[in-house]
Regions:
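Short hydrophobic segments within beta-strands
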Residues: 113, 132-136, 207, 239, ...
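Catalytic nucleophile-loop/oxyanion-hole region of alpha/beta-hydrolase
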Residues: 147, 165-203, 360-362
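Gly/Ala-rich beta-loop-alpha elbow adjacent to hydrolase catalytic centers
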Residues: 208, 212, 216
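Conserved beta-strand scaffold positions in the cores of enzyme catalytic domains, especially
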Residues: 82, 130, 164-166, 236, ...
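Alpha/beta hydrolase fold serine-hydrolase catalytic domain that processes acyl esters and thioesters
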Residues: 7, 184, 196-205, 217-381
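Short, surface-exposed "cap/lid" segments of acyl-processing enzymes
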Residues: 109-158
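Alpha/beta-hydrolase active-site loop signature
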Residues: 137, 169-173, 243, 348
């Protein structure tokens, strides 16, 4: 339930407290982190340590005041790169997508981070289109230029000639955003590329960071289960995925990584409160669409997973990899699994999206380049 800090005058009071607390603590942190032994991780730089702590404070703040998301159907500065997608035909939405009668498919905003593809035939055969779902714990984030500039630039630089398409799915922090709202929007946006723009699935790379990776896994699972209405993409790239929502906030809070990673337990609690399906739907936390670690996807497409060595969710990510590897076939007689993994030593959660803020740009660049090499090895053989 919302607390007193989520409504006025409580929000203003708490905001003033947060600003004062942060400003007073900043000089002390600057002195403290001059000594490597006092940093969250002794392998981190001063910049990484200070940025991590300040970002963690911010995460606690937004989860406490429950910051309201901006509108998702307004073009804004993206102008002609922004598109509004109407829901697809009703037969596209089945089973889990209709578990809550109160949540129906709606219009979806999306942003092209290259020259927009606006009509069938404009896409060139062989041109990769990264269908990227942003992170933010299902309560924050967007696919706009400001938030996606670093991620999209890495993908475009590492894969010249490609395109990046970012849907603005409904957030659980807004009315009507509880599960399966974001899931419906992801299906709508993916169907738009395949059916409206007629981009061949073999040219679409499904990608997502953090909660966006969780959503990408759900989208692939749905396409795999419903090939008659939604074909699978060429590959799946997962960046610091959130593969298990069974784990309790208390358990996460007790992990040593909690005091190193920037993910605030309050943010996880906010997500659980606003995102998880209503009890009346009969969809539990252990459902594979909610917690992918509970069942593999019987797919043949390549899956690549990146995570940081200091992530709070590292055990769950490793479990997801093991579960998925157990069902993956081998390459045409080669002894090489279709699940690629890449751990960034000592890194915190989601450096793909947050590197400019928390100081991991070179490591994020290396990770993207490795992902593209993996794709090339799988798709160009």
């Amino acid at each position: 339930m919302p607390g007193i800090w989520t409504r006025q005058p409580g929000t203003t009071v708490y905001t003033a407290f947060f600003v004062a607390f942060t400003l007073l603590r900043l000089p002390w942190l600057c002195v403290l982190y001059l000594f490597p032994s006092m940093r969250p991780n002794v392998c981190w730089t001063f910049r990484q340590s200070l940025s991590r702590t300040l970002f963690s404070y911010f995460g606690e703040y937004v989860a406490t005041v429950e910051l309201e998301p901006p509108p998702t159907l307004v073009p804004g500065n993206e102008k002609d790169k922004f598109v509004i997608i109407d829901p697809a035909k009703s037969d596209l939405y089945r089973d889990i997508l209709l578990c809550d009668p109160a949540i129906r498919p709606g219009a979806v905003g999306a942003v092209w981070h290259t020259k927009p593809i606006t009509h069938p035939g404009q896409h060139q055969s062989g041109q990769r289109v990264f269908f990227h779902l942003h992170g933010g714990a299902y309560v924050l984030g967007d696919g706009r230029d400001v938030g996606m500039r670093f991620t999209s630039s890495l993908l475009l630089r590492s894969c010249p000639g490609s395109a990046v398409f970012c849907p603005e799915y409904r957030l659980a922090s807004a009315p009507g955003g509880r599960f399966p709202a974001a899931f419906q929007d992801a299906v709508t946006a993916y169907s738009f590329l395949v059916h409206e723009l007629q981009i061949p699935p073999r040219d679409i790379i499904l990608s997502g960071d953090s909660a966006g990776a969780h959503l990408a896994i759900a989208l692939l699972r749905y396409a795999n289960a419903n090939p008659d209405v939604l074909p699978e993409p060429a590959a799946l790239l997962l960046w610091s995925p959130w593969p298990d929502m069974i784990i309790g906030v208390e358990v996460a809070d007790e992990r040593p990584a909690t005091h190193v990673d920037h993910v605030a337990p309050q943010l996880i609690a906010w997500t659980y409160r606003e995102f998880l399906p209503r009890a009346e739907t009969g969809v539990s936390r252990s459902d594979p669409y909610i917690s992918p670690v509970t069942a593999p996807i019987p797919t043949e497409i390549p899956i690549w997973v990146q995570w940081g060595g200091a992530e709070i969710l590292k055990p769950e990510i490793n479990k997801f990899v093991r579960v998925q590897e157990s069902s993956q076939s081998r390459y045409k007689g080669e002894r090489r699994a279709r699940v690629g993994t890449y751990e960034v030593p000592h890194a915190p959660h989601d450096i793909l999206a947050l590197a400019p803020i928390i100081g991991w740009k070179s490591e994020a660049t290396d990770a993207v380049e490795e992902a593209i090499r993996f794709l090339d090895g799988c798709l160009l053989e």
